[in-house]
Amino acid sequence: MLDLGCHPGAWLQVACQSLGPRSKGGLVLGIDIQETSKPGRYTDDRVKILHGDAREVDGTVWKSYAARGLDVVLSDMCHWTHGNSVIDSAKSLDLARTAFEISLYEEEGYRLLKPGGSLVMKILQGAGIEEFARELKTYYKTVKHHRPKATRSESKEVFLIGLNKL
């Protein structure tokens, strides 16, 4: 699993636990522009963290960590909000598009996100999201929105999910 925008580490913990026992192997690779320490609780040596901007990562880095590709790309990336819903949703959409582009990375037979894999992106509701969801449908068998029950009623946060990459 690749966790884009992994700071402060909650999804790293959830993802590591989802791998099951250490004997089953697996990898959770997190990246964030903020310095992030591996959470000590609920994680183990299968969690690796890179400090940097995911948009600037060279494909050889993805291949060196995930030589066989990944089953899930998760984006919890979020910009500093301005309080202007139009600007905030546009920036959020830009980050979701970045996650989508990273999930499509291919080179010489290598695919970062394996066929059948999933893409999960946090996004702020606003203009352009439905068009983006339609675009995702050309790459994923199923595309859906999810708003967790625990989300505050005033929050514009939703998850856009692509399942079963074609």
Where are these regions (language model features)?
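Conserved beta-strand signature within the Rossmann-like core of class I S-adenosyl-L-methionine
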Residues: 111-123
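Class I S-adenosyl-L-methionine
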Residues: 123-166
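S-adenosyl-L-methionine
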Residues: 31-81
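Conserved class I S-adenosyl-L-methionine
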Residues: 1-7
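Short beta-strand element of Class I
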Residues: 23-29
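A generic alpha-to-beta junction signature in SAM-dependent methyltransferases
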Residues: 19-23, 66, 106-113
